[in-house]
Amino acid sequence: MINNNKIFYSKIICYKKSLEATNKHGGDPPYFNWEEIMKIFLKAACVAAVAVVPSIATAACDSGEIVIKFSHVTNTDKHPKGIAATLLEQRINDEMNGKACMEVFPNSTLYNDNKVLEAMLQGDVQLAAPSLSKFEKFTKQFRIFDLPFMFKNISAVEAFQASDTGQAMLDSMQNRGLQGLGYWHNGMKQMSASVPLTAPSDANGLKFRVMSSDVLVAQMEAMGASPQKMAFSEVYGGLQQGVVDGQENTWSNIYGKKFFEVQDGTTETDHGILDYLVVTNIDWLNGLDADIRDQFLTIFNEVTELRNAESYAVNQANRQAIIDAGGEVRTLTAEQRQVWVDAMKPVWSKFESDVGVENIAAAQKINMAN
């Protein structure tokens, strides 16, 4: 099983500080016994090497256990994805003890979402849960989830994902070596900026951070904004320093990463869904013994069902936490929201050939039932 690594990482910090002390003044270091300097250097180098080489994580597992490394980019205790990943880790390590062990690497400590899929194909990580926008280079089908106002609410999203159309999308990257295991909800997206946003025209001329998605670029351009592609880990600093003026995200992300602290306020638009696809290397999955694979997938599906059912409550709690912390939350009337819909809906036609008109029709049919 996986051991507690706090002492291990504290040693890295101590050795790092010792080294930094030698260069504190930017010139010749203060006096050290050379033998001691070399000891510090070698210890720091060896320990740091262990920390950054992903394969060394196997040393924390019992001999003979299958190692499952799960890399994601969020925190572990306030974010729907982080909470789900931690629960999955706990259940795998409890129920598959002796057969498999899982270690979760949150907050981009192992890979960010832009690099994790390539690492997965190379066998350096077994599980990841990037946002659906991150799969553009592998398939265009998931673009339907980025189209603004495509889904009425989270219930419509879930119904579409559970449909034959949504389930078929899980297999859409098999020819590229990736297998989707299931969708994890974050929630509906909201808009925030350095100025109040009540109409799309308020975003005219502003720089908005977007994920690497052509759909989201077109969405921001439809408002007259300037889209800026930026990694999730860089967003807070970008907003704080004025590199970008605004962003779109869920309540969990806005609160968990404290984006509301460096924005004028957040407008409750519910204009899109931010969900994740839990994905694995298909060769790794198929290479597991049947009993191991079946138990792993059973646990995964149970965690997915439980956490997706609770994701709405998590987001609402984070929305309230923003208000309690002094953040501004602006709601729209039905008439105000329709102005946003009218401004963004033309984006659909630009991506019909990628998404499929039949899939758009299926999504709208589901909207009517939800």
What are these regions (language model features)?
Residues 34, 60-156, 165-167, 173-370:
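N-terminal secretory/targeting leader peptides
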Residues 1-67, 370:
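Short, low-complexity disordered leader/linker segments with a strong preference
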